[in-house]
Every structure is written in structure tokens, then in C-alpha cells.
């Protein structure tokens, strides 16, 4: 067959890329076309994403990708979850989208949960209640700006918004909508009952698009501006984790836990049915949507965010420390006896991450790290301990032994994290691909275009295109003591 090019806009919470994959009928050749920063902007009234900047960068990437003779067949977008934008009756953006790390939701949590309890919300939506969830964000917006009910015509999640800017079609895609806390977990459609209870207009959303959909060709205005040939804009796997899971080259899906490791780490399994038991709720697990309509039962845990913030801290102090250098420094620390709980709210907000880690260690009665290497080692080991905690919860809930961990995403470039995860979980860890979200985005387009037709075909394509690495577990001396101390640290902070 002739070569075919497919583009993926892959936006993370710290950077964005336009990627291209050239498909030759048996494998994919993935390459980065354009990379750019994505950082929220602090304004007087909150924290916002600079969507206009991002869209300008996306157009640059499309232009660069068109500079050879291989025709572009389609493009799709995947992003982080929960965030969204308001459009008015003219289809115009009302204001830049809020960032999920904005603090406005804290002012309205109490009144929100008086209307619907956390347990009821979980049972209806399958989504673990969290401050950053779309449902609480929108409720908070309506408390502060009740006039939104009069001026807003549609609400689009971030990938939906970019698709709209590219093609002019208003659509809500299923996988990204499944992160919102607004869908009925069984019907996989927006819950009228919840909307009515919270006073959210149902007209703001449309029934989610599932299993991929061709929206329209790239808008004539952009075609003319960029001087490119028209190609299809597809609503594929809009949520980056759903995309990443689609690209996992399972050796055996049964008995395998996935970890999608980026700014966040998503630790979970694929399931034919949602699990909304009290045990799942109390364990902090959530049910999100897969591209093929299945469910991702997972825990949203902190990922490389703390490492990224440490790097930002040190850069602001005039010290440029690369991620590779951070790992090298951490590898030299072999006698660590200090850990943090990465999911503690203190680590969720940006800034002063080194000070937060030291203060946490002090408050919990542990040795306070004095070197960069020790700080990074603490973070890496603590992430692996958090992964183990979730794996054991998944085993308890499903009554199924999890023998293998498949890690994907940018975080797997941290080989120390991968090996420590194997050691601490005492399980085989298989890593790859690094660019799982982009590849899953590509695969969702190939499904939509009917180029591929099954998950097995998709997995074979990834195996033919990407390299995977295996990490065998190595014994850790007195690991039961380490695990027990970590549990005590977590219990101690929860009782504070």
C-alpha cells in the first residue's frame, strides 16, 4: 500500500506536541513534528490555560507536518482530563479555560456535597469525587457567575474545543467526558438527574461520541492560512489515558495492571463492567471510559509532577538539573529510610516543592533530606510504594492475582523508577511505548478510518513498531518494614 500519514495532537499538563505517524501497512513510524510548553497562567481571579497560545502552536505543527510528499489523512486530539471551556450563542469562547489546579472549588465543596454526597456521586457516575472534577468546577462557576446560565450555549472539554477550532463541529467525545463526573456510569451518557440536582443546564452538552467519529475536514480558513491540503478531523480517544491504554501491547491482559506514567500516574486495569462497590469507593478507585466502550478501573495518583516541580524550583534558583541528572543523583542513594505520601494535598499545588517535601518529612518524624539526590530518591521510592498500594487494592476488589505491570508514557524514561517499581511490587514490569498517548491517539484514528479492526490488530501494530523493556524484580532487604512504615506515614497524615 502507499504510505499514509496521521497526525496526533498530544497535550499534557506541562507540554504539548504535534506528532506524526507514517503507516506502511504493517508498522507505524512515529516522530515528533513540533513541541511546545503548556503552563497555566495566574490571573487575578484564578489559574487559566492559555488555549489561544496552544492553538497557535498546533497550527505551526500542522504546517510543519505538511512539508513532505506523504499525504495527511487525518488528525485527532488527546489531552488531560476534566477541564473545559464555555461557548456563547455565537459559538465564541467566553474566556480561557480554568486549570484544574485552580483553587476556586475549595470555596464551594461544602455546599456541593450537601446537594449530593460523595458516595451517591460515586454510585451514579463511577467517578471518584475530587476537587478538580468537572462537576465541582462547573458548580463552582455557577455559584460565582450565575449569569452563565443565560450566556452559555455549549460546554466543550479541551479536546472537543480544539476539534471545534479545527473543524467547526460541536461534539463531546466519550473518553474525555467520562472523566467529568457528569456521566451516568451505566448509560455512558450525561446524567439528567445529576444536572437537575446541581442546576446545570442539560443543553450545555450533547450525547458523547463513541468509538471514534469523523467530524469534518479541516476548516477551509485554516487550509488557506496554512496552505495545506484538506484532511479529516476525528474525535478519537480524547482523554490521554484512554489513548495510552489503547496503545498497551499486552502480553496477557488478564492479570496485568497498567501504569500510564506522566504528570499523573494512572494505575489500573481494563474491565467489561464498572465497579462501584463501597470497597472501590473507599479505596479511592474510579471508573473511566475506554475507546472501545469498556471501563478503566484505576487510581489517579501523583506521577512525575513532583519531579517536574523540583526541577522548576531549582531552575528558579539558577540551577539547571536535567531529569537524567536527577536520576543519576538518586541512584547514588542506597540507604534511604524516608518516604512521603505523593497524593497528599500539600504536593498538589505548584511551587516550593523541595520545602514541602522537607516539611512533610519533619512533620512525620523522619530524617529530613539534605541533598538533591536524596530528595529525588524519596520521591521515586514513594511513587513505587503508592503503585503497590493500588495494585493490592485492585487484587482485593477483583479477586484476581496481578502478576505483571505494564508501564507506558514519558515517565518510563526514568529507568530507576521502573526498576524500583519492579522491586517494590515484586512483579515483572514491562515498559513501552514511551509515546503511548500519541500512539493510542493514532490507533483511534486508524480504527475510525477502518484501517484496523480489532484490539489484537492494534497491539500487533504497536509490537511491530515499538521497543519494550523488561524489568525483573530484585529482592529488597526488609521490604515488609518499608511497606509498614509507608502505611504508618499515610495513616499519620490522614489523622492530622
Task: Walk through the language-model features, giving the residues of each.
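Short, well-ordered amphipathic alpha-helical segments that serve as non-catalytic structural scaffolds
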Residues: 53-66, 187-193, 386-393
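Active-site core segments that coordinate phosphate-bearing ligands/cofactors
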Residues: 7-8, 20, 113-125, 139-157, ...
